[in-house]
Amino acid sequence: MGNSRNKRGKREANRQRTVEALARAQSGADTGAALQLPQKKFYRQRAHANPFSDHQLKYPLSPAHMDWASHYPAFENPDPAQTNLGGFRKLLKDVEVVDIGCGFGGLLIGLAPLLPETLIVGMEIRIQVLDYVNTRIQALRTQQRHFKLKSAGGGGSDAAPESPAAPPTPSEAASPDSTTPSEQQAPTTLVPGGFQNISAIRSNTMKFFPNFFGRGQLSKIFICFPDPHFKARKHKMRIISETLNAEYAYALRPGGLLYTITDVEEYHHWILRHFREPEVDGAVPCDDGADGIKELFERVSDEELQQDPCVEVMREATEEGKKVSRNKGNKYVAVFRRKADPEWPA
């Protein structure tokens, strides 16, 4: 028991040192060039959280009451009169991309330079994991600001290049030799957008997803390596269901994409059934919801997916994706396009 308290104290002390170092770098008292990113081992938490428990979450009354400006200060509307129903400053653009169950933020970091002008948010229910992600993002933003200042002022030899370097390819990011250093050391070059376009919030998607996003607001939704909940009595906890798919369809604009990836073949077939894809392996569609889901989504062909760089990031840049690659496991990808709303009969 005493050893457990000692380990917990060490983790808390390390997290505090990380926060203090970040605060010094943000204030300009310390350089951000060698800023260390937080380490996952000091942000330990259970792998799963019960979505049906009362987690005492804070959530907006409606999308118009959400405080997005605190998450994306670089995109804050400069006009102080531009506020939403919650009294918070509006943004110059809306959040368009969501990573449901973002975990330790690998997909957010991978997508940030790929979509530098698009606001991306991760949704995570676990407190310690969310704390890690946001600390990591703040550290990356701080280092990028230092690099930009040094580049503009012709700083010393440790200054970043004047032009943003191309981000590493997903396969390079997923190499086993790069996973450990990349967690500890921030990037050494400028990246497009400077990670100002990503953030993460604590939320229970199964309960409060429509409280954050309005109708047709999103262009992409990612669900990467979700908890498979193998036991039949826990299937109701799966993040893919016809009920939830209807909510995703509400928030996705026509033509928007919903990306899914899992390393569990049974879950992959579950996903296909709940998006009404019975032709795959002779699967029979489920009967737990309305047939209207089939009218809202269509599956994207493999030929189209080969041209989508987001698919490669989803496969190789996430922490779970890297682990599956190291274990030489299979990855099952399915992407669905939001159809235009059907017309009402005359």
Curated annotation (Swiss-Prot):
List all Low complexity biased stretches. 171-182
- Which Gene3D superfamilies does the protein's record reference? Vaccinia Virus protein VP39
Which GO MF term does the entry hold, naming one?
tRNA (guanine(46)-N7)-methyltransferase activity
Q: What is its EC number?
A: 2.1.1.33
Q: Where is this region: Disordered?
A: 149-191
Q: Where is S-adenosyl-L-methionine annotated to bind?
A: 101, 124-125, 204-205, 224, 318-320
**What pathway does the UniProt record associate with this protein?**
tRNA modification; N(7)-methylguanine-tRNA biosynthesis
**Function noted in UniProt:** Catalyzes the formation of N(7)-methylguanine at position 46 (m7G46) in tRNA.
User: What's this protein's name?
Assistant: tRNA (guanine-N(7)-)-methyltransferase
Q: Which gene encodes it?
A: trm8
